[in-house]
A protein has these predicted regions:
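Extended alpha-helical targeting/anchoring segments
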Residues: 1-300
Length: 300
């Protein structure tokens, strides 16, 4: 098996510093652990200029799309990494919940007014990875990447960016899809379903939206500063927009035959003092109800 090559760079705890250099590049993507404020994640990963951009077609089956992804991985070729790094080249992207309809026969009652593919991935032959345990940042190159492209990336990240970031702002207030009365009525129906034994948990959510203008990267940086989370990401879209994701939860991780999920269930209010915080945390940890709910979510 071929081995990836590695080029060290100055360590930067905040991946936004490096990502700003490539944020306008095609297929720019950042997987962000929220450092230096959030402390759970170990690695950040960013890349751009994918070899291929792959989106599921409206009438394409999920199995056919997944096979296309596998075929592209095969064409890239397997490679090992010389260090304990999480990426040797491969696919980065998103699978929406609606992608499930490409796999299963499910009812479709929501109107598609975003017109985004239900899944989109890029095939990447390089990445810049920061390891916050070892305090290192380095470029990782798949062995198939041309020498000229490796040198271009080394020179690019050895420089600085002076681009001005266009401020991001909402040009109208956020508005929900459901009115307050519609939301209340839906909650009442859910309670009736639970009391009747038809279900025992409902993930009831709604969408808020507003007109906006400016650079989506500026919006991401503002959200990141206000609420750093260990499972965050920024993915640019070919049409000029972006997908921004900031979550304290890991939905699922599959590695070496093991599956891990990190849901968060159960809350307590912040206290006025550190002692109150500690007492609330101890109460939460000792709560049979909250533990049972968390175990139920893991089982599901």
């Amino acid at each position: 098996m071929l081995t990836c090559s590695v080029h060290p760079l100055p360590y930067r705890a905040n991946p936004a510093d490096y990502f700003a250099i490539i944020r306008h590049a095609p297929g720019a993507v950042l997987l962000d652990s929220g450092r230096p404020t959030a402390d759970r994640g170990r690695h950040d990963l960013l890349s751009a200029w994918p070899l291929e951009q792959l989106a599921v077609l409206p009438d394409e089956s999920g199995s056919d799309f997944l096979q296309r992804l596998r075929d592209n991985l095969t064409r890239l070729g397997e490679a090992s990494v010389p260090l304990d790094l999480p990426f040797a080249g491969g696919l980065i992207g998103y699978l929406s919940y609606d992608f499930g309809r490409h796999l299963e026969q499910l009812p479709s009652v929501a109107r598609d007014d975003l017109h985004l593919p239900d899944a989109r991935f890029g095939l990447y032959a390089w990445a810049l990875i920061s390891d916050h345990q070892l305090a290192t940042s380095q470029l990782v190159f798949h062995p198939t990447l041309a020498d000229s492209e490796r040198q271009r990336l080394i020179e690019l990240f050895s420089g600085t960016t002076s681009d001005e970031i266009e401020p991001f702002r909402l040009t109208a207030p956020m508005s929900p899809d459901l009115s307050a009365d519609e939301y209340r009525q839906a909650l009442e129906r859910i309670q009736q379903y639970i009391q009747a034994g038809d279900c025992y948990q409902v993930n009831f959510a709604q969408r808020f939206r507003a007109e906006c203008q400016g650079d989506p990267w500026a919006a991401y940086c503002a959200l990141r500063a206000a609420c750093p989370t260990p499972f965050s990401g920024f993915q640019s879209l070919p049409e000029g927009g972006a997908v921004l994701s900031l979550s304290p939860e890991r939905f699922v991780k599959v590695s070496q035959g093991l599956v891990e999920t990190r849901p968060i269930k159960g809350t307590r209010p912040r206290g006025q003092t550190a002692a109150e915080d500690a007492a609330n945390a101890a109460e939460l940890l000792a709560s049979p109800k909250d533990r049972a709910e968390n175990l139920m979510i893991v089982d599901l």
